Each structure stands twice: as structure tokens, then as C-alpha cells.
Amino acid sequence: MKRLILLIITCYGLLSGYANTDTASDSLLQVLQTLPHDTTRLSTLNDIIKIEQNNYKCIQYSDSLMQEALKLKNDKYASLAAYYHLLYYYNRCEQDSVAKWIVKMEPLVQKSGLWDYFFDARRFQIDLYTFTEQYELAISEANKMKQKALDIDNNRGTVAAYQCLSNAYIGSQRWDEGLKALEEAYRLLPKNGNAVVHISVLSQLISVTKEMKDNYRQLKYLQELENVLRKFIIDNPSLKDGFADVFIFNEIFYAHYYLNTNQPQIAYSHIEKSKKYLTENTYFMYKVLYYDIYAKYYQSIKQYQQASAYIDTTLTMLKKDFTSDYAEQLLKQAKIWVEAGDNNRATTLYQQALAIKDSAAMALSNTQMEQIKKS
């Protein structure tokens, strides 16, 4: 599920997670009603937005933060308000809205100096280009972003630019170039820098090395991610619930490693560990990965009916909006039935998948040619 890789690693905890969000939000709203229109009020609005980041209230409060910050000529909170709008629309893949808020955010950041947030926002925009298969545009914009970050000596922007380059290269099947860009991002990480950025880069490395079947490096990065996560949660225990998706990711990819090294029982223990982090609020992509790893596990122990049933679950989830991933899952299901000895069923699935892939490949080839002509 290569397109899924592009989404699952981008926004790990860019806003702080909260447990008991309804209680925390209600409490802060009561405080907000008593505050004068000053910086304290802006700070409280900012905290409320962090809690409400996953629903439409985020936009309502971000609008309020923007209006009040502009009245007070507070460029810091105006920049943050623009960033929260961007994050909300990025998570919903609304490319035009992201572009609109990038334009609004940049002049505010030039005054506030919040360049880390601006480069995060640019990363959202460029990764959406990649997600919508505008690979040459993504590469061009990532290189512009890298140069701007180098010009102002912003490490986070440089790291993010290399991550964007990696996504675009991998999305267009240039795996070696993608891994090289990602390893450069990893090399540039400050030793005691932002843990969330470290987690994001490591998660990409884990996803890519797994796809490239590089078990040695995958295990190395899994162990490092586990250590970074452990230290982060020890230092920030209240944020553990907000990082549940990262724990799911880590356990699922440990399971992949152990399945790839013929250790299914250890793999199963990690799948079971991932289950305890699943909730109704778990991000869609992680739910797909969760069912997919169960399919892989049951295939490894030759329980083909159960393996196929889990693939069916992922197909239902992917069919509407993720055509190429849907085709990839059909191919996985075909391989399951080949192993099970049901060649007729496998052939039908192969034909369905290849028809989708041929259509997608032709469209992608035409799109890339047009992008190259324009560049």
C-alpha cells in the first residue's frame, strides 16, 4: 500500500495530543469566557484548538484566533491560526484550501519568525501533490523549499524538503533515490532536536525499508523509533493517548519484520499489542494497515480463508478513494488463493487487479509527461 505510506507518516503529533478531550475542552472554554482580549486569551484559544484539531470546531476556533490575533497585531498567533487551518484541510486532502492558507501564512511568518511551522505547512502542500500523483511538481516544489530553508539556515525546513523529495521519488517508483533523500533527512536530524520530527523521519524509513525488503535496516529503525517513543512519553506522559497511532504503526511494522523473517508467533504478539491502541478515533490508514497485517499473518500460517477475509475488509475500505491500493490488495488476495491451490479464483483476481493497474499506469505516464513538458 505505497500511497498509504505518503499519508501515515506526515503529521505525527504536530499538535499535542490530549486525553479526556471533552473535559479539557469544556474546562478551557469556561476559562475563555472570563478572559480579557489579550495574549492570555490567544494562548487559551490556541490550547482549545489543539484539543479540537480533528473536527470542524478546529476551524471555528482557528477563525476566532486569527481575528483576535490580527486585532492585537500578534503575528505569532496569527501565524499559528493559519497553520491550524492548513493542518485541518491537509488531513482532508483539500488541496485548494491548503494552497490558499499557504499564501496567507507566509507574510505572517516573515514577521513572526515561525519558520518551522511554515515549512511543516509547505510539506503538507507538497505531499498532497505527491498523493495526487503530481510527482514532477512535487519534486520541483520540494527543491525550491530546500533552497529557501538553506538560505535562512532552517534545519527543520531542510529535513522536511528531503522528506518531500523522498515521497515524490517513491510515489513514482524511484525507490533508490527516495531512500537516499530520506537518509539525508535522517542525517540532518539534530541529536536532541524535535522528537516529533525524529519520529516522522524514522517512520518513513521503516515504511520504505520494509517495502524494499531490507530487514536489517528496518529492524534498526524500528528499534530506534521504539526508543524515541519511550523517551518522549516518559518526558510527556499526558501525551501518550495522542500518540496511539504511532504505537499502532510501530507494532504493525514489528509484525511485518517478524513475518518477513519467518517468526510468525512473535509477529502475532506484536499484532495483539497493536490492538490495545485501536479506538473509534484511530486514523483510517492505520485501520487498513491493521487488517492487512492480520491477512499477512494468517497467510503465513496457511489459514487462507481467514487471510482472504481480512483482505476483503481492506478492499471495502479502499475501494472508493484509493484505486491503486485497492488493486494492490487484489493482487495480494490472488497470491493467497494461488498458495491455497484455487487457481481459478486467483486468475479472476489477477485480471481485475491488472486492469486497474494498467489504467492507472497509463494515466500516470500521461500525467508525468505533461508535468515534464511544463517544467
Predicted features and spans:
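Hydrophobic positions within repeat-based interaction scaffolds
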Residues: 20-43, 56-60, 96, 219, ...
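Solenoidal tandem-repeat scaffolds enriched in leucines and small polar residues
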Residues: 149-229, 239
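Post-signal peptide N-terminal segment of secreted/secretory-pathway proteins
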Residues: 36-117
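Bacterial Sec-dependent N-terminal signal peptides
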Residues: 1-32, 39, 49, 84, ...
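Residue signature of alpha-solenoid helical repeat architecture, marking inter-repeat boundaries
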Residues: 39, 76, 116, 156, ...
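Amphipathic alpha-helical segments of tetratricopeptide repeats
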Residues: 29-33, 63-70, 103-113, 143-150, ...
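Tandem amphipathic alpha-helical repeat scaffolds
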Residues: 43-55, 80-94, 120-133, 157-173, ...
